[in-house]
Curated annotation (Swiss-Prot):
Keywords: ATP-binding, Bacterial flagellum biogenesis, Nucleotide-binding. Gene3D superfamilies: P-loop containing nucleotide triphosphate hydrolases. GO terms for cellular component: cytoplasmic side of plasma membrane; cytosol. This is Flagellum site-determining protein YlxH. One of its GO terms (biological process) is bacterial-type flagellum organization. GO terms for molecular function: ATP binding; ATP hydrolysis activity. ATP binds at residues 39-46. PANTHER family: CELLULOSE BIOSYNTHESIS PROTEIN BCSQ-RELATED, SEPTUM SITE-DETERMINING PROTEIN MIND HOMOLOG, CHLOROPLASTIC-RELATED. Belongs to the ParA family.
Amino acid sequence: MQMNRYDQAATLRAKMEKRERVLPMVYSQKAKTLAVISGKGGVGKSNITLNMALALQDKGKKVLLIDLDIGMGNIDILIGNSSSATIIDVLTDRKPLLQSLSVGPKGLRYISGGTGLDVMFQLDQRKWTFFANELSHALSQFDYVLFDMGAGLSKDQLPFILSAEDILIITTPEPTAIMDAYSAVKHLVLTENKLSMKVAVNRCRDQKEGLDAFARLSRTIHMFLDVQVQFAGSVSDDVIVSKAVVEQVPFFIKSPQAKASRSVRILADALFEREETRHKEDKQTFIEKLSSFLMRRA
Protein backbone atom coordinates (compact mmCIF):
# COMPACT_ATOMS: atom_id res chain seq x y z
CA MET A 1 0.00 0.00 0.00
CA GLN A 2 1.44 3.36 -1.04
CA MET A 3 2.05 5.95 1.70
CA ASN A 4 0.45 9.37 1.23
CA ARG A 5 2.40 12.56 1.82
CA TYR A 6 1.04 12.90 5.36
CA ASP A 7 2.24 9.40 6.31
CA GLN A 8 5.63 10.06 4.75
CA ALA A 9 6.01 13.31 6.69
CA ALA A 10 5.01 11.60 9.95
CA THR A 11 7.52 8.81 9.34
CA LEU A 12 10.26 11.33 8.61
CA ARG A 13 9.47 13.30 11.77
CA ALA A 14 9.58 10.11 13.84
CA LYS A 15 12.99 9.24 12.42
CA MET A 16 14.33 12.72 13.11
CA GLU A 17 12.99 12.71 16.68
CA LYS A 18 14.59 9.33 17.28
CA ARG A 19 17.88 10.63 15.92
CA GLU A 20 17.74 13.71 18.15
CA ARG A 21 17.12 11.51 21.18
CA VAL A 22 20.24 9.43 20.63
CA LEU A 23 22.78 11.77 19.03
CA PRO A 24 24.77 13.92 21.46
CA MET A 25 26.27 17.31 20.68
CA VAL A 26 29.75 16.67 19.28
CA TYR A 27 32.56 18.94 20.52
CA SER A 28 36.00 19.01 18.91
CA GLN A 29 37.78 15.99 20.38
CA LYS A 30 41.17 16.69 21.89
CA ALA A 31 41.64 13.69 24.14
CA LYS A 32 43.05 10.29 23.32
CA THR A 33 40.91 7.52 24.79
CA LEU A 34 41.91 4.23 26.40
CA ALA A 35 39.56 1.60 27.83
CA VAL A 36 41.23 -0.63 30.43
CA ILE A 37 39.61 -4.04 30.90
CA SER A 38 40.28 -7.43 32.44
CA GLY A 39 38.79 -10.85 32.05
CA LYS A 40 38.23 -11.18 35.78
CA GLY A 41 38.65 -9.23 38.97
CA GLY A 42 41.72 -9.31 41.18
CA VAL A 43 44.40 -8.75 38.52
CA GLY A 44 45.13 -5.14 39.55
CA LYS A 45 43.30 -3.41 36.70
CA SER A 46 42.12 -0.35 38.65
CA ASN A 47 45.47 0.04 40.40
CA ILE A 48 47.38 0.02 37.12
CA THR A 49 44.89 2.41 35.50
CA LEU A 50 45.14 4.89 38.36
CA ASN A 51 48.93 4.85 38.59
CA MET A 52 49.32 5.01 34.81
CA ALA A 53 47.06 8.09 34.82
CA LEU A 54 49.31 9.62 37.48
CA ALA A 55 52.39 8.83 35.37
CA LEU A 56 50.83 10.73 32.45
CA GLN A 57 49.80 13.59 34.74
CA ASP A 58 53.38 13.70 36.04
CA LYS A 59 54.53 14.44 32.47
CA GLY A 60 52.40 17.58 32.40
CA LYS A 61 49.43 16.08 30.57
CA LYS A 62 45.79 16.82 31.43
CA VAL A 63 44.31 13.45 32.34
CA LEU A 64 40.75 12.43 33.19
CA LEU A 65 40.13 9.04 34.79
CA ILE A 66 36.55 7.78 34.55
CA ASP A 67 35.66 4.86 36.80
CA LEU A 68 33.00 2.95 34.87
CA ASP A 69 32.94 0.03 37.27
CA ILE A 70 29.52 1.31 38.24
CA GLY A 71 28.61 0.72 41.86
CA MET A 72 31.81 -1.22 42.51
CA GLY A 73 34.41 1.47 41.91
CA ASN A 74 37.86 1.20 43.50
CA ILE A 75 39.49 4.50 42.55
CA ASP A 76 38.29 6.38 45.64
CA ILE A 77 39.54 3.55 47.85
CA LEU A 78 42.95 3.42 46.20
CA ILE A 79 43.33 7.19 46.55
CA GLY A 80 41.94 7.32 50.08
CA ASN A 81 39.23 9.78 49.18
CA SER A 82 35.46 9.99 49.50
CA SER A 83 34.04 11.77 46.48
CA SER A 84 31.05 14.05 46.94
CA ALA A 85 29.77 13.12 43.47
CA THR A 86 30.09 9.88 41.50
CA ILE A 87 29.35 8.62 38.02
CA ILE A 88 25.98 7.46 39.37
CA ASP A 89 25.00 11.11 39.97
CA VAL A 90 25.84 11.93 36.36
CA LEU A 91 23.99 8.91 35.00
CA THR A 92 20.83 9.13 37.08
CA ASP A 93 20.51 12.78 38.12
CA ARG A 94 21.88 14.40 34.95
CA LYS A 95 24.56 16.21 36.94
CA PRO A 96 27.19 17.80 34.64
CA LEU A 97 30.26 15.56 34.39
CA LEU A 98 32.88 18.30 34.60
CA GLN A 99 31.21 19.69 37.74
CA SER A 100 31.24 16.22 39.32
CA LEU A 101 34.96 15.57 39.09
CA SER A 102 37.16 14.99 42.12
CA VAL A 103 40.80 16.05 42.33
CA GLY A 104 43.37 13.41 43.21
CA PRO A 105 47.15 13.41 43.63
CA LYS A 106 49.15 15.61 41.24
CA GLY A 107 45.90 17.36 40.29
CA LEU A 108 44.50 14.26 38.56
CA ARG A 109 40.82 14.74 37.68
CA TYR A 110 38.67 11.67 38.13
CA ILE A 111 35.13 10.56 38.79
CA SER A 112 34.39 7.68 41.09
CA GLY A 113 32.28 4.70 40.11
CA GLY A 114 30.40 4.96 43.39
CA THR A 115 28.95 2.12 45.41
CA GLY A 116 25.64 0.31 45.20
CA LEU A 117 23.81 -1.48 42.43
CA ASP A 118 24.77 -1.20 38.78
CA VAL A 119 22.42 1.50 37.53
CA MET A 120 23.35 1.34 33.86
CA PHE A 121 20.65 -1.21 33.21
CA GLN A 122 18.09 1.36 34.40
CA LEU A 123 19.11 4.12 32.01
CA ASP A 124 16.68 5.25 29.38
CA GLN A 125 17.80 6.56 26.01
CA ARG A 126 17.68 10.22 27.02
CA LYS A 127 20.01 9.61 29.96
CA TRP A 128 22.39 7.70 27.72
CA THR A 129 22.42 10.67 25.34
CA PHE A 130 22.96 13.14 28.18
CA PHE A 131 25.95 11.12 29.40
CA ALA A 132 27.39 10.89 25.88
CA ASN A 133 27.03 14.66 25.55
CA GLU A 134 28.87 15.17 28.83
CA LEU A 135 31.63 12.85 27.64
CA SER A 136 31.89 14.77 24.38
CA HIS A 137 32.46 17.99 26.33
CA ALA A 138 35.07 16.32 28.55
CA LEU A 139 36.97 14.96 25.55
CA SER A 140 37.52 18.53 24.38
CA GLN A 141 39.09 19.56 27.69
CA PHE A 142 41.71 16.85 28.35
CA ASP A 143 44.74 15.29 26.67
CA TYR A 144 43.91 11.77 27.81
CA VAL A 145 40.74 10.09 29.03
CA LEU A 146 41.16 6.68 30.64
CA PHE A 147 38.13 4.46 31.27
CA ASP A 148 38.50 1.97 34.11
CA MET A 149 35.94 -0.62 33.09
CA GLY A 150 34.37 -3.22 35.36
CA ALA A 151 35.81 -6.73 35.46
CA GLY A 152 34.23 -8.88 32.78
CA LEU A 153 32.26 -7.41 29.91
CA SER A 154 28.64 -6.41 30.39
CA LYS A 155 26.36 -5.41 27.54
CA ASP A 156 26.27 -1.83 28.77
CA GLN A 157 30.06 -1.52 28.95
CA LEU A 158 30.68 -2.69 25.40
CA PRO A 159 29.83 0.62 23.64
CA PHE A 160 32.45 2.46 25.70
CA ILE A 161 35.10 -0.22 25.23
CA LEU A 162 34.55 -0.54 21.49
CA SER A 163 34.48 3.25 21.00
CA ALA A 164 37.89 3.83 22.59
CA GLU A 165 40.92 4.33 20.37
CA ASP A 166 42.81 1.63 22.24
CA ILE A 167 41.84 -1.22 24.53
CA LEU A 168 44.29 -2.32 27.22
CA ILE A 169 43.75 -5.80 28.64
CA ILE A 170 45.24 -6.41 32.08
CA THR A 171 46.17 -9.95 33.04
CA THR A 172 48.71 -11.81 35.19
CA PRO A 173 50.95 -14.82 34.48
CA GLU A 174 48.46 -17.15 36.22
CA PRO A 175 46.86 -19.65 33.79
CA THR A 176 43.34 -18.76 34.95
CA ALA A 177 43.97 -15.05 34.35
CA ILE A 178 45.38 -15.81 30.89
CA MET A 179 42.28 -17.84 30.01
CA ASP A 180 39.97 -15.11 31.31
CA ALA A 181 41.83 -12.54 29.21
CA TYR A 182 41.38 -14.77 26.15
CA SER A 183 37.64 -15.01 26.87
CA ALA A 184 37.42 -11.21 27.08
CA VAL A 185 39.19 -10.79 23.73
CA LYS A 186 36.94 -13.42 22.16
CA HIS A 187 33.85 -11.59 23.38
CA LEU A 188 35.12 -8.32 21.90
CA VAL A 189 36.12 -9.65 18.49
CA LEU A 190 32.80 -11.46 18.08
CA THR A 191 31.22 -8.00 18.36
CA GLU A 192 33.81 -5.98 16.42
CA ASN A 193 36.83 -7.53 14.71
CA LYS A 194 38.78 -4.36 13.90
CA LEU A 195 40.08 -3.27 17.28
CA SER A 196 43.38 -1.97 18.60
CA MET A 197 44.05 -4.29 21.56
CA LYS A 198 47.12 -4.31 23.75
CA VAL A 199 48.05 -6.49 26.72
CA ALA A 200 49.82 -5.58 29.96
CA VAL A 201 50.91 -8.38 32.28
CA ASN A 202 50.80 -7.48 35.96
CA ARG A 203 52.68 -9.01 38.92
CA CYS A 204 55.67 -10.26 36.98
CA ARG A 205 58.86 -11.39 38.69
CA ASP A 206 60.82 -10.12 35.71
CA GLN A 207 60.42 -9.01 32.11
CA LYS A 208 60.77 -12.59 30.83
CA GLU A 209 57.78 -13.79 32.84
CA GLY A 210 55.67 -11.02 31.34
CA LEU A 211 56.81 -11.81 27.81
CA ASP A 212 56.20 -15.55 28.30
CA ALA A 213 52.68 -14.92 29.63
CA PHE A 214 51.91 -12.62 26.71
CA ALA A 215 53.28 -15.17 24.24
CA ARG A 216 50.91 -17.85 25.60
CA LEU A 217 47.94 -15.52 25.37
CA SER A 218 48.89 -14.14 21.96
CA ARG A 219 49.35 -17.62 20.44
CA THR A 220 45.96 -18.75 21.71
CA ILE A 221 44.23 -15.63 20.40
CA HIS A 222 45.87 -15.94 17.00
CA MET A 223 45.18 -19.67 16.74
CA PHE A 224 41.49 -19.59 17.63
CA LEU A 225 40.41 -16.03 16.77
CA ASP A 226 42.84 -15.13 13.98
CA VAL A 227 43.48 -11.66 15.38
CA GLN A 228 46.60 -9.94 16.65
CA VAL A 229 47.17 -8.29 20.02
CA GLN A 230 50.20 -6.21 20.92
CA PHE A 231 52.40 -6.40 24.00
CA ALA A 232 52.16 -3.12 25.92
CA GLY A 233 54.48 -4.12 28.75
CA SER A 234 54.66 -5.74 32.15
CA VAL A 235 54.38 -4.45 35.69
CA SER A 236 56.75 -5.75 38.35
CA ASP A 237 55.48 -7.75 41.31
CA ASP A 238 56.51 -5.23 43.95
CA VAL A 239 55.87 -5.33 47.70
CA ILE A 240 55.34 -1.55 47.62
CA VAL A 241 52.04 -2.10 45.76
CA SER A 242 50.32 -3.99 48.58
CA LYS A 243 51.69 -1.53 51.15
CA ALA A 244 50.33 1.39 49.16
CA VAL A 245 46.90 -0.24 48.86
CA VAL A 246 46.72 -0.69 52.64
CA GLU A 247 47.76 2.93 53.19
CA GLN A 248 45.34 4.09 50.45
CA VAL A 249 48.08 5.97 48.63
CA PRO A 250 48.83 5.26 44.94
CA PHE A 251 52.17 3.45 44.71
CA PHE A 252 53.38 5.92 42.07
CA ILE A 253 53.00 8.64 44.74
CA LYS A 254 54.27 6.60 47.69
CA SER A 255 57.45 5.48 45.96
CA PRO A 256 58.04 7.00 42.50
CA GLN A 257 61.26 5.04 42.00
CA ALA A 258 59.88 1.64 43.03
CA LYS A 259 59.95 -1.14 40.44
CA ALA A 260 56.17 -0.99 39.97
CA SER A 261 56.25 2.80 39.55
CA ARG A 262 58.96 2.58 36.92
CA SER A 263 56.93 -0.14 35.20
CA VAL A 264 53.77 1.96 34.87
CA ARG A 265 55.81 4.93 33.66
CA ILE A 266 57.29 2.76 30.90
CA LEU A 267 53.84 1.29 30.19
CA ALA A 268 52.28 4.74 29.80
CA ASP A 269 55.07 5.81 27.45
CA ALA A 270 54.71 2.63 25.37
CA LEU A 271 50.95 3.03 25.06
CA PHE A 272 50.97 6.66 23.99
CA GLU A 273 54.36 7.29 22.36
CA ARG A 274 53.02 6.84 18.81
CA GLU A 275 49.36 7.64 19.32
CA GLU A 276 49.61 11.26 18.09
CA THR A 277 49.93 10.29 14.42
CA ARG A 278 47.42 7.47 14.59
CA HIS A 279 44.95 9.63 16.49
CA LYS A 280 44.90 12.14 13.64
CA GLU A 281 44.33 9.34 11.13
CA ASP A 282 41.30 7.86 12.92
CA LYS A 283 38.21 8.16 10.76
CA GLN A 284 35.76 8.32 13.67
CA THR A 285 36.02 10.01 17.04
CA PHE A 286 35.06 8.33 20.29
CA ILE A 287 31.71 10.13 20.39
CA GLU A 288 30.92 9.32 16.77
CA LYS A 289 31.51 5.64 17.48
CA LEU A 290 29.53 5.79 20.71
CA SER A 291 26.67 7.55 18.93
CA SER A 292 26.45 4.73 16.41
CA PHE A 293 26.01 2.28 19.27
CA LEU A 294 23.33 4.50 20.80
CA MET A 295 21.48 4.51 17.49
CA ARG A 296 21.47 0.72 17.46
CA ARG A 297 20.08 0.61 20.99
CA ALA A 298 17.26 3.06 20.24
